[in-house]
């Protein structure tokens, strides 16, 4: 499902633990990391897509998380020209995303990146809230910045928490 401007509707998932760290997942067979995300199917709401993608990509269900907030509108990024498939119709030039901020309610052991026949990730880790901005592929960076900035006040309620989140650090990586 691609809109008239060539953008595919999509949900982005920022999953935070009780320390305000966020789940950062490694694309299978690559040294590329990102937040879980995925397309919205025809007749599916963004929230429906969120829960489907949560299950498909990291093995969690609705009872494992709590929705804290979501972005007010759609955030868009364009794909680099080399990634646009001009032979497919309609042509997809990028993604428009509704971002959700979730709180993890279950133990870390519930996260499973290998729970499907075709997993998208082969590892994950908890990282400080702002760490992904310096690590994500460049064409997604502005959307990540906008989503993280808009949602941060919903996660961090005082300046001390905010400053702790600004300390970019990696945590122990989990393999599948």
Curated annotation (Swiss-Prot):
Name under which the protein is recorded: RNA pyrophosphohydrolase
Nudix hydrolase domain segment(s): 6-149
Cited Gene3D superfamilies: Nucleoside Triphosphate Pyrophosphohydrolase (3.90.79.10)
Gene Ontology BP, a term: mRNA catabolic process
Natural source organism: Marinobacter nauticus (strain ATCC 700491 / DSM 11845 / VT8)
CDD domains documented for this protein: NUDIX_Ap4A_hydrolase_plant_like
Keywords, ordered alphabetically: Hydrolase
Top EC class, one word: hydrolase
EC number: 3.6.1.-
Known role: Accelerates the degradation of transcripts by removing pyrophosphate from the 5'-end of triphosphorylated RNA, leading to a more labile monophosphorylated state that can stimulate subsequent ribonuclease cleavage.
NCBIfam families reported in the protein's UniProt record: PRK00714.1-1, PRK00714.1-4, PRK00714.1-5
Keyword Hydrolase: yes
GO cellular component: cytoplasm
Hydrolase keyword on record: yes
Example GO molecular function: mRNA 5'-diphosphatase activity
Cofactor or coenzyme needed: a divalent metal cation
Sequence motif Nudix box, residues: 38-59
Family under the similarity heading: Belongs to the Nudix hydrolase family. RppH subfamily.
InterPro entries attached to this UniProt entry: Nudix_hydrolase (IPR020476), NUDIX_hydrolase-like_dom_sf (IPR015797), NUDIX_hydrolase_CS (IPR020084), NUDIX_hydrolase_dom (IPR000086), RppH (IPR022927)
């Amino acid at each position: 499902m691609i809109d008239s401007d060539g953008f595919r509707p999509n949900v982005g998932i920022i999953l935070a633990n009780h320390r305000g760290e966020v789940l950062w997942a490694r694309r299978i067979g690559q040294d590329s990391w990102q937040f879980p995300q995925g397309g919205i199917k025809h007749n599916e709401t963004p929230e429906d897509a969120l829960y489907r993608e949560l299950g498909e990509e990291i093995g969690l269900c609705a009872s494992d998380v709590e929705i804290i907030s979501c972005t007010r509108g759609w955030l868009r990024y364009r794909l680099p020209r080399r990634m646009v498939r001009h032979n497919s119709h309609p042509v997809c030039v990028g993604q428009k995303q509704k971002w959700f901020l979730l709180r993890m309610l279950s133990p870390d052991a519930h996260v499973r990146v290998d729970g499907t026949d075709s997993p998208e990730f082969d590892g994950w880790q908890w990282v400080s809230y702002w760490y992904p901005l310096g690590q994500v592929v460049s064409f997604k960076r502005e959307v990540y910045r906008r989503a993280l900035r808009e949602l941060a006040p919903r996660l961090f309620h005082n300046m001390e928490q905010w400053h702790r989140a600004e300390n970019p650090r990696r945590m122990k990586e989990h393999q599948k």
